[in-house]
Curated annotation (Swiss-Prot):
This is Large ribosomal subunit protein bL17. Part of the 50S ribosomal subunit. Contacts protein L32. The gene is rplQ. One of its GO terms (molecular function) is structural constituent of ribosome. Keywords: Ribonucleoprotein, Ribosomal protein. GO terms for biological process: translation. It holds the Pfam family Ribosomal_L17.
Amino acid sequence: MAYRKLGRTSSQRKAMLRDLTTDLLINESIVTTEARAKEIRKTVEKMITLGKRGDLHARRQAAAYVRNEIASENYDEATDKYTSTTALQKLFSEIAPRYAERNGGYTRILKTEPRRGDAAPMAIIELV
């Protein structure tokens, strides 16, 4: 299987890809290097496909990869409580239904200007 090493050990690379995948699911658009964007595209596409399946096994597989981070927090004045939505809940309730009729190609990579400082090629990766 071909993949990019991204100048890191396998555990560091896996952690970074999990973080970037979770950030993309929460924010729906992130700025990163071109190589990282191309690499996380694979995992994000797999997570959205799991979200479209929607069964318990798919939810557990996605939960094993996506970080348990809060995606949004809303205040309900009637009950005087905060309700929060995690990245996993957002994946299954908001993102996956949006792509129900689409077979793959859930992300878009737009190349931008090189990063100032080391001239690394940068890109914006976003959900279509």
